[in-house]
Amino acid sequence: MNLSSLSFRLLATLLGACVVVAPASAERIKDLAQVGGVRGNALVGYGLVVGLDGSGDRTSQAPFTVQSLKNLLGELGVNVPANVNPQLKNVAAVAIHAELPPFAKPGQPIDITVSSIANAVSLRGGSLLMAPLKGADGQVYAMAQGNLVVGGFGAQGKDGSRVSVNVPSVGRIPNGAIVERALPDVFAGTGEITLNLHQNDFTTVSRMVAAIDSSFGAGTARAVDGVTVAVRSPTDPGARIGLLSRLENVELSPGDAPAKVVVNARTGTVVIGQLVRVMPAAIAHGSLTVTISENTNVSQPGAFSGGRTAVTQQSTITATSEGSRMFKFEGGTTLDQIVRAVNEVGAAPGDLVAILEALKQAGALSAELEVI
């Protein structure tokens, strides 16, 4: 055996050892949970988009657009008589919404989405005038203004016909709002950090507590319920941030997801979890197709006979039944076997939904069946 062959075998052995030792499905805490209180907040506002190329609101059908414009002009020192209602096509009333990210500070920009409220055909080319964005408490947290970016296209004729591509009545303004008010500091005055799992799972909570205690010392973390883990932390904000920086990178293997089958009855979409099993069962699958065709028969009387032309309908009904097939599931059948068996009999997605519902009703499906 030469030296190069020995080196290759040694390298292969070491790589194999590394594969065995490395955690199979370790995930970071930051991917499994979020810090309690650290979240975004919804903002909403109302405003006007101007500068549209004739694609704005039809003000005869949206009087609030004219009212908003008159109020705006009044604030700018332009008085419009109360009995004058300008018929404009380059203005649109819009709703504005955005998310105020955690720890946002005054002066920072955030993205906003602008949506038409009335009957504007398109917001392309428009500019949003300054509008306040309020939170759920009624306080103004940001001011929005800017030029819209619209991905769709729309046009409408005088006869009411219209052509549109995508959704031209919704646009975005990157960095279109400036934060004016900061949220209260969620890091002040508590001696614990709360971690909330994205999915309820007692096994994951238990493993998270064990992983944190292993990294920071026994008694650092405690389980509160199937979602929440409380971690002891210093009260100093700087020290808490340092702790969180280390804490969110702790790795653990989460618990297995529960066996579940999710069915969308409207679209025929079926999602089957990896741990779904089927108890022993036999299924027969077949289909019956009924075709109804209508033919019109006209009976024309002879000349000078005094008869009348008769029109009759002739219906032809044909029923065909494709060969029904039966397949059997043994105990502990896995996801791959279920899909393979159903595909072999040529079942459509709608048929698969019916088969899964029947299996659940018969007690042969060892999983939760959720229909959405």
UniProtKB/Swiss-Prot annotation:
Protein name: Flagellar P-ring protein
Function: Assembles around the rod to form the L-ring and probably protects the motor/basal body from shearing forces during rotation.
GO terms under cellular component: bacterial-type flagellum basal body, distal rod, P ring; outer membrane-bounded periplasmic space
Signal peptide interval: 1-26
Recorded GO MF terms: structural molecule activity
InterPro entries linked: Flag_FlgI
Location of the protein in the cell: Periplasm; Bacterial flagellum basal body
Keyword set, alphabetical order: Bacterial flagellum, Periplasm, Signal
Subunit structure: The basal body constitutes a major portion of the flagellar organelle and consists of four rings (L,P,S, and M) mounted on a central rod.
Family from the record: Belongs to the FlgI family.
Domain of life: Bacteria
NCBIfam families tied to this protein: PRK05303.1
GO term, biological process aspect, one: bacterial-type flagellum-dependent cell motility
